[in-house]
Regions:
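P-loop NTPase catalytic phosphate-binding loop
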Residues: 12-208
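Interdomain "pre-motor" coupling segment immediately N-terminal to P-loop NTPase/helicase cores
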Residues: 1-11
Length: 210
């Protein structure tokens, strides 16, 4: 838009007469209509948001999570927050939908991921997928760098098998290359939302075409 205008999150659901289950708001289109993304869709499942510092990727993560919390009860939706820097997702730490307190250390994060895997396996056995669990990870590369192979393996397992059990990853990263993420984990993010990056090559890496 020639002139940027603020968009109030609370106003977006009011513009819709019927919001599909587990549909999150991304913002508005050029003509002012709400943009939605439905997590259970086969071509969605997990979302990777890429962009340089200050590009708004963490703000978009917060919008997605807050919009889901606004339109779903705790019996329908649970949220896991992993934030190594304890800044980006901290404003959501008071949500009643949280499965556990916000995790910031590698040990806390791995314990939460393993708890989610246990739940995923239980659901596979029972054949259920609700309540949906959104696992939000800010600064994904920092988490993998500090948590090592155990954290990467846990994330990859959830990315590969989580959708049918109702588990969805929502992650933010500055430059999500295969070398940094691991090729298997990166391949299991069907949706890539790319903000401002430092170069054309960074954009290609973030979008998964390089």
């Amino acid at each position: 838009r020639p002139e940027a205008e603020p968009v109030l999150l609370l106003s977006l659901p009011r513009q819709l007469t019927n919001i599909p289950p587990y549909a999150a708001c991304l913002g508005v289109s050029d003509d002012g209509h709400p943009l939605l993304i439905r997590l259970p869709s086969p071509d969605v499942a997990h979302i990777l948001i890429a962009g340089a510092t200050g590009s708004g990727k963490t703000e978009l993560m917060r919008v997605i999570l807050a919009s889901l919390a606004l339109t779903h009860r705790q019996s329908q939706l649970q949220i896991v927050l992993i934030d190594p820097k304890q800044r980006g997702l901290a404003p959501l730490a008071g949500l009643r939908h949280l499965l556990a307190p916000l995790a910031s250390t590698p040990e806390q994060s791995l314990a939460l991921l393993e708890r989610c895997i246990t739940e995923m396996e239980r659901r596979d056995h029972e054949g259920r997928s609700t309540p949906r669990i959104i696992i939000a990870v800010d600064e994904l590369l920092d988490l993998i760098a500090t948590g090592g192979k155990a954290v990467e393996a846990a994330l990859t397992r959830i990315a590969q098998r989580g959708r049918e059990a109702g588990l969805h990853l929502l992650a933010g990263a500055q430059k999500p290359s295969s070398a940094a993420l691991g090729s298997m984990l990166k391949a299991n993010f069907p949706v890539r939302l790319v903000g401002r990056v430092g170069s054309v090559e960074d954009a290609r890496v973030a979008a998964g075409v390089s």
